[in-house]
């Protein structure tokens, strides 16, 4: 009886392991789907804000926790939908000047203050919004979208680099990447 119990135990741990692997794979795929789900409303909001020349700064958490930055602004939790994103950055909104922070596929804060990149020759022509995006991208692995008020141009900062004046197609690729 002992041998059979042992073999049964071995079999069940093996089964358990493959089940766990399957569940983890499903969770990863679900996470990816959830991440993809926020891209469409973000894209729509960005296209509208760029067209209306509404300035915006949106930081999307990746691996490194953005909670400390979220707490520099107004903390709340809301689903990512285009109208809400646009309303927050609307000129008369009390939160329009700061950054929006997105984590776990939800908006977790707005009106946040981000660390500003040092002034270098590289970014001497950048405005405060772009320098803040660059600063956060130097300190974290967040993906950051910037929309300029002046020209309604879309830029994207990631890992200390800023891609300026990109198309919405390019933005989508950078968000999905």
Task: Pin down the residues of each PLM region.
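Divalent-cation
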Residues: 1-177
